UniProtKB/Swiss-Prot annotation:
Its EC number is 3.1.1.14. Its main location: cytoplasm. The active site is at S138, D168, H243. Belongs to the AB hydrolase superfamily. Lipase family. It comes from Arabidopsis thaliana (Mouse-ear cress). It is found in: Cytoplasm, Cytosol. Pathway: Porphyrin-containing compound metabolism; chlorophyll degradation. A motif (GXSXG) lies at residues 136-140. This is Chlorophyllase-1. Coiled coil: none annotated. The gene is CLH1. Disulfide bonds: none annotated. One of its GO terms (biological process) is chlorophyll catabolic process. Keywords: Chlorophyll catabolism, Cytoplasm, Hydrolase, Plant defense.
């Protein structure tokens, strides 16, 4: 998506297809909490944004269980290159926080971004607070849903969201051991959301990895999240990929090692999965924020255009009816 000019016209810059890297160069800016700095975030954040002057929508990105925000560098740069400012907080340190604590921390970071993001952006790069979206992977996908559903006690109630995207969201290890807050109701279309929602899943997420249990178990993964959404909603499942296959290659440290071996992984190139995830996010944001329906509808109509094999067939249920 191109930059929003400071005028009634949103965009005039033509960008490549959503699955390709966009036309805008990007940069990554780590920002840490600093005592006595009113512009510092409440949690460490990693900002990924274009370096070209313009005003861009904001996307909050929440990492998965025990993961690091910099594990997603390739995907975040892909999205940012299409004209978005990504804010990825680091919500855990040595040990993951409780589920409700994580959701409340996410709300605090969103408040910070709405007020102080500009102080940390490159010169002439501005955030358009009118368009703020939520994206999350794994437990972070569940966090994004929880925030959108109003479970972040810290969130400024005046802040609204334009779109919600869960990437292989996970709500616990089984139906009896779920992370707080318990947002799944196991009732179809029970989520009270009035924004477009996309859910991305993986075919290998519900599979055991030798003796290791599934990272995205049945009844707590993308299938249930999608069932509980109302139109407008979309669903895409990368059949040959696992829960961690969207992460960068060669992840550092012990956490990176564990991220590479805990889950059932696919045998295909991870770069294809990253292009798929980045492309779905870009195409769905264009659909949700600007009403640009061509790319997302093309993916649904002709799944072969996706870098990753999609099975079952993708779905897009619009509020005015079903498009297949």
């Amino acid at each position: 998506m191109a930059a929003i000019e400071d005028s009634p016209t949103f965009s005039s810059v033509v960008t490549p297809a959503a699955f390709e890297i966009g036309s805008l160069p990007t940069t990554e800016i780590p920002v840490d909490p600093v005592e006595n700095d009113s512009t510092a975030p409440p949690k460490p954040v990693r900002i990924t944004c274009p370096t070209v002057a313009g005003t861009y929508p904001v996307v909050l990105f929440f990492h998965g269980f025990y993961l690091r925000n910099y594990f997603y560098s390739d995907v975040l740069n892909h999205i940012a290159s299409h004209g978005y400012i990504l804010v990825a907080p680091q919500l855990c340190k040595l040990l993951p926080p409780g589920g409700q604590v994580e959701v409340d921390d996410a709300g605090s970071v969103i408040n910070w971004a709405s007020e102080n993001l500009k102080a940390h952006l490159p010169t002439s790069v501005n955030a358009n607070g009118k368009y703020t979206s939520l994206v999350g992977h794994s437990r972070g996908g569940k966090t994004a849903f929880a925030v959108a559903l109003g479970h972040a006690a810290t969130l400024d109630p005046s802040i609204t969201f334009s779109a919600l995207i869960g990437i292989d969201p996970v709500a616990g290890t089984n139906k009896y051991i779920r992370t707080d807050p318990h947002i799944l109701t196991y009732k179809p279309e029970s989520f009270e959301l009035d924004i477009p929602v996309a859910v991305v899943g993986t075919g290998l997420g519900p599979k055991w990895n030798n003796v290791m249990p599934p990272c995205a178990p049945t009844d707590l993964n993308h299938e249930e999240f999608y069932k509980e959404c109302k139109a407008t909603k979309a669903h895409f499942v990368a059949a040959d990929y696992g829960h961690m296959d969207m992460l960068d290659d060669d992840l550092p440290g012990f956490v990176g090692f564990m991220a590479g071996c805990m889950c059932k992984n696919g045998q295909r190139k991870k770069s294809e999965m990253r292009s798929f995830v980045g492309g779905i996010v870009v195409a769905f944001l264009k659909y949700s924020l600007w009403g640009e329906k061509a790319e997302i509808r093309l993916i649904v109509k002709d799944p072969s255009v996706s870098p990753a094999k999609l099975d079952p067939s993708p779905e897009l249920e619009e509020a005015s009816g079903i498009f297949v």
